[in-house]
């Protein structure tokens, strides 16, 4: 299955963000992508780095998500969209998945909150797992990558792929990028699971937009705006993958 992501520099202007999103959807449709993934808060901008939380109203979010739903329906491409989301009087840092008919089929709310996120959002409780064309896909967002427990839940659910929207940017911190890339490699290898990360380009990306295989190797990456297209399959497990899976299951049984 062709799965793509489209990194760009989001900001406070939702119409401008939607312009970039439309470009991504057009490119994905032309390349035959089944699912197109965008970064953390791609629709609204990530507060307070790319915009201010006070400027992200519930009405704007509803308008933007309706536009994204329409894009999915018109293009026939499923879309995973990072956004601020209002629900039940609470505000979340979320990723929503719309199918090719524009229907919401999955929602994940960021669970690991600290600093700005803890001030602006409510922690989520959803598992963020859906299946598309036989491939089981989980979602985790940005700071979640620091917590192995959140990914072990995907292992337990036998997820084939984890999509990770980020807005982790800085002026220029190559050491931080190496550390966070290491986290992604480890989360992929220890859970025998592919990972597709997509990060904002509003500043220096401290996390690569990249596709990691089940052994933690980077298969593809992109550090400028445009489409990163991946042919995601569920390969036969090699000797090392089998060993990690068997032992992880053994340790899980001991925990319970």
Where are these regions (language model features)?
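CN hydrolase (nitrilase-like) catalytic-core segments centered on the catalytic cysteine
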Residues: 64-78, 146-227
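C-terminal beta-strand edge segments of enzyme domains
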Residues: 107, 129, 200-256
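Cys-nucleophile CN-hydrolase/nitrilase-fold catalytic domain and related Cys-dependent amidase chemistry
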Residues: 14, 23-100, 170-193
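Structural motif
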Residues: 34-35, 137, 161
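Conserved beta-strand and immediately adjacent loop positions that scaffold enzyme active sites
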Residues: 80, 94, 126, 208-209
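Extreme N-terminal starter segment of soluble prokaryotic enzymes
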Residues: 1-4
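Active-site catalytic loop in hydrolytic enzyme cores
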Residues: 86-157, 172-182, 238-255
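Short polar catalytic/cofactor-binding loops
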Residues: 7-13
């Amino acid at each position: 299955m062709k799965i793509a992501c489209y990194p760009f520099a989001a900001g406070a202007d939702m119409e401008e963000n939607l312009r970039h999103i439309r470009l991504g959807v057009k490119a994905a449709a032309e390349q035959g992508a089944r699912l197109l993934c965008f970064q953390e808060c791609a629709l609204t901008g990530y507060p307070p780095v790319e915009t201010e939380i006070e400027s992200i109203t519930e009405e704007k979010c509803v308008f933007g998500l309706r536009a994204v739903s329409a894009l999915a329906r018109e293009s026939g491409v499923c879309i995973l969209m990072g956004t601020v989301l209002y629900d039940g009087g609470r505000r979340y840092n979320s990723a929503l998945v719309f199918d090719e008919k524009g229907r919401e089929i999955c929602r994940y709310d960021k669970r690991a909150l600290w600093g700005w996120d803890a001030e602006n959002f409510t922690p989520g409780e959803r598992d963020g797992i859906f299946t598309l064309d036989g491939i089981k896909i989980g979602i985790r967002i940005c700071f979640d990558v620091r917590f192995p427990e959140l990914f072990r839940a995907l292992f337990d659910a036998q997820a084939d792929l984890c999509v990770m929207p980020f807005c982790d940017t800085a002026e220029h911190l190559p050491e931080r990028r190496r550390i966070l890339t290491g986290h992604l490699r480890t989360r992929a290898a220890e859970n025998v699971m592919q990972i597709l990360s997509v990060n904002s380009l509003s500043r220096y990306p401290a996390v690569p937009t990249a596709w990691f295989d089940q052994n933690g190797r980077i298969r593809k990456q992109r550090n400028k705006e445009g489409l990163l297209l991946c042919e995601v399959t569920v390969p036969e497990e090699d000797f090392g993958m089998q060993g990690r899976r068997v032992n992880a299951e053994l340790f899980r049984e001991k925990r319970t």
